[in-house]
Amino acid sequence: MSALKRMMRVSNRSLIAFIFFFSLSTSCLYFIYVAPGIANTYLFMVQARGIMLRENVKTIGHMIRLYTNKNTTLNGTDYPEGNNTSDYLVQTTTYLPQNFTYLPHLPCPEKLPYMRGFLSVNVSEISFDEVHQLFSKDSEIGPGGHWRPKDCKPRWKVAVLIPFRNRHEHLPIFFLHLIPMLQKQRLEFAFYVIEQTGTQPFNRAMLFNVGFKEAMKDRAWDCVIFHDVDHLPENDRNYYGCGEMPRHFAAKLDKYMYILPYKEFFGGVSGLTVEQFRKINGFPNAFWGWGGEDDDLWNRVHYAGYNVTRPEGDLGKYISIPHHHRGEVQFLGRYKLLRYSKERQYIDGLNNLLYTPKILVDRLYTNISVNLMPELAPIEDY
C-alpha cells in the first residue's frame, strides 16, 4: 500500500512537471508568434553577450601575447614591444576643410566638412505640426521633401522609401533627424512613405516594391534607400549614396547591442542603385507578417552576382525608436520560401505586382496608401 502511495506521489509530481513545462513552452511559442520583435530582441541580446565575452577573451589573450613577446610580427613587419598592433583600430579618414569651395558644375564630394561624425539622436516625441513649422523656414525643401544642393552637383539622386503602418509618432522624429543629415551629405533626395491599409498582415517587402515603382514615376532617381521608420543613424559620415555593390547601412543597431546578428543580416536600412534593384527583380511579395524578406533579398543580391558592403567601424551605428505597438505576427511560412529563393526570384517581385495606390503629397513626403492582398501578386508554380 505504501509503495502504491509512493508511486502515485511520483506520478503526480511528473504530471505537475509535465503541465508546467508544457505551459511554459506554449507560452514562449505564443509570445514569439505574436510579439516577434520583442522576442528576437531578447534572443539577440543573449547572443550578443556571448559574442562580446568571446571578443573580450580574444582581446585579453592578444594583449598578453604582446606583453610576453619582446617583438611581435604583423604582416611580416617586426614591431618592438609596446607598439599598438590592435586589429580593432580603424584608420581615420580625411574630410575636406571648412573653407573648401564648391563649384556648382562639379560633383559634390562624399567627405564634406559638415560631416562631423557622431550625431546626437533625440527620440523624444514631437508633433508633425512642430516639425512642419521648423522646416517651413527652409524654402529650398520642395513638395514631398524634395531637396537638391545648389553649390555643387549631387553625386546621387536618392529616393528614401519608408514602409509604414500605425507608427505616426515615429514619422516626425524620423524627418527631424534625417533631413539635416542628408542635406549635409549634399545628396538630392525625397521621401516616400508607403502605407499599408486593410486588415492583411504587414508586407514590408511588397510595400517597398510599390514605393519603388511610384518613386520611379515621380523622378529620375538613381539610388534607392529602403529605410525602416524607427531606425535613426548615429553618424552623419554614414553616406547615403549608393555604389557598385548593394549597401547595408544599419550594421550596428542599439537593440542588438551594436553587434551584427548574423553575417547575412540585411535588415533595417539598405540601399541599391535603380539598376541593381531591377536586376534582382526587387523584393519578394510573398512574405506576409514578420521576418524573412530581408534574408530573401540577401539571397537575390548574391544570386545576381553582387556582394553586400557595410560601413566601416562605428559609422553603421543606429538607434531604434522605442514603440508601444504590438509587433506583427510571425510569418511561419518564410523558411519554405527561403529554401526556394533562387527558383522564385524572377517570378515573384517587381514583375508580378498589381496595386492601386492613393497618393497624397505632403510638404515633407509623398504618402502612398495601398490595400495589399495576396492576389495582387499572383505567382506561377516553381
UniProtKB/Swiss-Prot annotation:
One of its GO terms (molecular function) is metal ion binding. InterPro entries: Galactosyl_T (IPR003859), Galactosyl_T_C (IPR027791), Galactosyl_T_N (IPR027995), Nucleotide-diphossugar_trans (IPR029044). The keyword Transcription regulation does not apply. Pfam families: Glyco_transf_7C, Glyco_transf_7N. Disulfide bonds join 108-152, 223-242. Glycans are attached at residues 71, 75, 83-84, 99, 122, 307, 367. GO terms for biological process: carbohydrate metabolic process; central nervous system myelination; central nervous system neuron axonogenesis; ganglioside biosynthetic process via lactosylceramide; lactosylceramide biosynthetic process; neuron maturation; protein glycosylation; sphingolipid biosynthetic process. Inhibited by EDTA. Mn(2+) binds at residues 230, 323. It is found in: Golgi apparatus, Golgi stack membrane. Residues 36-382 are lumenal. Its main location: Golgi. Pathway: Protein modification; protein glycosylation; Sphingolipid metabolism. It is a single-pass type II membrane protein. N-acetyl-D-glucosamine binds at residues 292-295, 334. Keywords: Calcium, Disulfide bond, Glycoprotein, Glycosyltransferase, Golgi apparatus, Lipid biosynthesis, Lipid metabolism, Magnesium, Manganese, Membrane, Metal-binding, Signal-anchor, Sphingolipid metabolism, Transferase, Transmembrane, Transmembrane helix. The keyword Cell membrane does not apply. UDP-alpha-D-galactose binds at residues 163-167, 202-204, 229-230, 258, 290, 323-324. Coiled coil: none annotated. GO terms for cellular component: Golgi cisterna membrane. Residues 1-15 are cytoplasmic. Disruption phenotype: Single knockout mice are born normally and grow to adulthood without apparent abnormalities. Decreased glucosylceramide beta-1,4-galactosyltransferase activity seen in the brain of female mice whereas minimal or no reduction in the enzyme activity seen in the male brain. Double knockout mice of B4GALT5 and B4GALT6 genes develop normally during embryogenesis and perinatal stage. However, they show growth retardation and motor deficits with hindlimb dysfunction at 2 weeks of age, and they all die by 4 weeks of age. Catalyzes the synthesis of lactosylceramide (LacCer) via the transfer of galactose from UDP-galactose to glucosylceramide (GlcCer). LacCer is the starting point in the biosynthesis of all gangliosides (membrane-bound glycosphingolipids) which play pivotal roles in the CNS including neuronal maturation and axonal and myelin formation. Belongs to the glycosyltransferase 7 family. This is Beta-1,4-galactosyltransferase 6. It comes from Mus musculus (Mouse).
